[in-house]
Design a protein with these regions (language model features):
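Selective transmembrane helix interface/packing segments
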Residues: 1-214
């Protein structure tokens, strides 16, 4: 995890330096074009799922997606994916959990708490439902990434090392599926759930705005 954090930090510093040095009157280079495309995609995705008020969460969503995606595909570089450790996925889900209730208190005030007791008979279920949100998000990401890591470990363990060199195309395809394809999907799902859960506490007029954007 430390290696990935350091790599992302260096990349962020390099990107920030390139953006500051860029001349607005000149045509941006390939690197800046890619950065601009990524930022526009994240802003568009955030706005379409969270509405205008959700745009301020774009930085968090972009950082979260990048972090989870890089962690998921780190197996391609011979590293054990940090997201295969529940000690990583749970804090990520807890950050989302805090943002959900921060947003709830901001827009609903005391009503964010009182709605847990409506109706009174369903209060235990409502509380369990709130607690289940970070647990389900963290366990989903942890389980999917861990299963891919275990599968690749079993495959490498079953195939003799002398034969592995001749089966690199097969291992390449498996890594593309378990690391890249599955990793990208899990990062996308985690961020989508984050946006949906945070946005559900926005006022009703914001929900209408999201529908109009879609």
């Amino acid at each position: 995890l430390l290696i990935i954090v350091l790599a992302l930090t260096v990349f962020a510093l390099f990107a920030n330096r390139a953006i500051k040095k860029a001349n607005p009157e000149e045509v941006p280079g390939p690197f800046l074009n890619v950065i601009e495309l990524i930022v526009e995609l994240i802003d568009g995705l955030t706005k379409s799922n969270m509405g205008k008020r959700g745009v301020r969460f774009s930085n968090y969503i972009g950082t979260l997606f990048t972090m989870v995606l890089v962690c998921n595909i780190s197996g391609l570089f011979g590293l054990r994916p940090p997201t295969a450790d529940y000690g990583v996925t749970l804090p990520l889900a807890l950050i989302t959990f805090v943002l959900i209730h921060y947003n709830g208190f901001k827009y609903e005030k005391a009503g964010h708490v009182t709605k847990l007791f409506q109706p009174v008979l369903l209060t235990p279920i409502n509380i369990i439902g709130e607690i289940a949100t970070p647990l389900s998000m963290s366990l989903r990401l942890f389980g999917n990434v861990l299963s891919g890591t275990v599968m690749m470990g079993l495959i490498y363990g079953l195939v003799p090392k002398l034969i592995q060199a001749f089966l690199w195309p097969v291992f390449g395809v498996l890594h593309v599926y378990f690391d890249v394809f599955s990793g990208a999907i899990q990062a996308y799902v985690f961020c989508m759930l984050t946006m949906v859960f945070i946005a559900q506490n926005f006022p009703e007029d914001e929900a209408q705005d999201r529908k109009s954007v879609v």
